[in-house]
Regions:
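N-terminal, well-ordered alpha-helical segments
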Residues: 32, 52-56, 72, 86-89, ...
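Context-gated lysine
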Residues: 11-14, 24, 36, 60, ...
Length: 146
């Protein structure tokens, strides 16, 4: 398995299995099959509505948690400091994990500044191992980094 090292030193598998548009009734089986053939990076999102099924697969797969890399994304309806923080804690429960390896802000709309502050706080608490963004243009990324 090849890895990329993120800016904070966390190693992320280069190849991941994404669950976008996988039906709830198929998701758990698909994730279990992906893990069985060697995938260790599973990518989901709040807006995919299948975090719970991913969590079921994680808990049943028999692979130690530290060998898996789980990514999820906060949806814009959950932006703002309080809503983002609560949504991430809810995602952790659905995923049945004590921490999430990578949490991304899914889109550059609404109060992503507040959401980013929540991610930073949860990162500091060890509930998130890495923070990132998805679908952000360079100028929006520069705004957050400032």
């Amino acid at each position: 398995m090849e890895y990329v090292t993120l800016s904070n030193g966390v190693k992320m598998p280069k190849l991941g299995f994404g669950v976008f548009q996988i039906a709830k009734e198929d998701c758990e089986r698909c994730v279990l099959d992906a893990i069985k053939i060697g995938y260790r990076h599973i990518d989901t999102a709040q807006s995919y509505f299948n975090e719970e099924e991913v969590g079921n697969a994680i808990s049943k797969c028999g692979i130690p948690r530290e060998e898996l890399f789980i990514t999820t994304k906060v949806w814009i309806d959950n932006y703002g400091y309080d809503k983002a923080k609560q949504s991430i804690l809810k995602s952790m429960k659905k995923l049945k994990v004590e921490y999430i390896d990578l949490v991304l802000l899914h889109q550059p709309f609404s109060d992503y500044y507040g959401a980013y502050r929540a991610l930073q706080e949860l990162y500091g608490e060890g509930k998130i191992r890495a923070i990132g963004v998805s679908n952000f243009s360079p100028d929006r990324l520069a705004d957050i980094a400032a």
